[in-house]
Amino acid sequence: MRSSVALAAEARSRFAAESHVPIDSIKIALSLAAYGASLPLPHEFDGFYPPPYGPQAYVHPSADPAAPPNRNAFRADERAQEAQAEAALTAFHLERLRAYAADAQTWRSIDALAFETVPLAREVRAIRRAVAALEDDGLKPEERKPWWVCAVYTGGEFPEQQQGGAGAASGGRLAARDVLAAYFGDSDVHGEGGARYAVPDAFGVNCTAVAHVAKAVAAVSDALEETGAAAQPWLVLKPNGGQTYDMDTRKWGWYGGESPSQGDEWAGQLGDIVRAATNKGVWGGILVGGCCKTGDGELRALAKVLDSNGPTGEIN
């Protein structure tokens, strides 16, 4: 795991030397995936986690037609199990953080922590607890890193289902205000006490088709405005190039009526989202880039669009 950071640091040094740019201007963000990405069949897009990380293991409908519907949210009468799931996810993320922090050179090479493609509110809370626990391990103030959590918005909606009654989870999806509460709320939703929740520097959306990002950002921006919070978090946007990942075939493709778009079109759409979010006035700044199936063409086009919009800044 730590060798990837060493490779990134070496690439940074070589690029700085060859391009004659200050090495301090090149930042390394450690990308850490959701628990669902570690499963044999990845579930970071839908959040169907097996116990103790979730309510039940995923069962493909064709494998067992009689199986109960798959769900990623606990019922209202399963609060104890939900608390256990959050604790298990905290342990998962903390173990990985400690693996990097244990080596001083590795940790010095990292400039920011990017938790990405996170589909569940309880996993966001778990990540906050893991970062807090790492800080409590004895990190000096100068050793702490800016960090953020990027959610995935499959089809334009946050994947987590709303909690239902004793029978099943509700068919609706978690509202934007509830997602924000998982990111920035200061209370222990389980009422256990003792757990500390670090506050991320930014809210993000990644691994989502750019066509769906506008809806997600608008909803979250409105919810953030409604809170009236004085602090302004940053916004991180890393949409896909447009293709969708099929979890059954494990392949990327153009599904659901989507069609290939050129880099200029992709960058133009993302630029419009950045302008709208900036004009909303609730974000401290915007960090923008690309995720899956974006390449040099998209990023060059994006750079031109952002240059015409003016700088968005950086997290500091």
Predicted regions and their residues:
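Domain-level signal for soluble alpha/beta catalytic cores
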Residues: M1-N316
